[in-house]
Amino acid sequence: MKKITMKDVRKQDYYYAEAIKTLQTNVNFAGKDVKAILITSCYPNEGKSDIAFSLAREIASSGKRVLLLDADLRKSSYVGRYQVQAKVSGLSQFLSGQIGVGDLMYATNFENLDMIFAGPSVPNPTALLGEGLFGTLLKKLREYYDYIFIDTPPVGSLIDAAIVAQKCDGAIFVVESEAVSYKVAKKAVDQIEKSGCRILGGVLNKVDMKKDKYYSHYKDRYHTYYEKIENRQEDRE
């Protein structure tokens, strides 16, 4: 496996670091059958890719074998965001038959963390992700990795995330504080649920910690909704 260097130049405060650790704990308690986890949002720029990278890196640092898979075949940002200097191949090239699996995966400079990049943007990402080759790839990856985090395009305007969700064990929603209405978030969650994917929870991102009253109200409302989700899942069992 080829090795690449990813530079994390983001500034993270104490609250962010602690939130990622809490998210890691919640993922660990999701169950041993939860390996492939989709991470998405309602709209672009809510911070889902930052959360995906931070969570993958945190869990990898605990000794777990982790793969971060960028399935945003429309507008990927990982190569530029993390200053990857090497020329890399990606998922779009693999799914279109241009490269084999041996040229798809990269070991990063972060211990236990491997990466699959999205590759060049393509005109038919929905069709590529919906084909059997993607499911076959995930099946093989499950045999080696403890966790596979799959970063997809936002749910709000594209169907890609729902297609990928069909092949995942769980999903995490990233919601930007004060940017997404409860109605929009609920509609996005429902769309993923219809694919048969279990909702593991949500992340309220970009919170202004000085606005305690707003944060508490917003958090409580989303917490109530996810409690309903958990209760529905328990009823099914």
List the predicted regions and their residue ranges:
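A short, charged, Gly/Pro-tolerant segment at domain boundaries
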Residues: 38-45, 205, 236
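Residues that mark the start of a beta-strand
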Residues: 36-38, 63-67
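C-terminal lobe/tail of nucleotide-utilizing enzymes
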Residues: 1-26, 33, 183-237
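Alpha-helix N-cap/loop-to-helix initiation residues
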Residues: 16, 45-48, 157, 181-182
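P-loop/Walker-type NTP enzyme "switch/lid" segment
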Residues: 2-17, 21, 25-32, 41-46, ...
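Short, well-ordered alpha-helices that flank and scaffold nucleotide-derived cofactor binding pockets
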Residues: 25, 57, 61, 166, ...
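Conserved sugar-transfer catalytic core signal across GT-A, GT-B, and GT-C glycosyltransferases
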Residues: 51, 55, 160-161
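Conserved catalytic-core segment of NTP-binding enzymes
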Residues: 118, 126-224
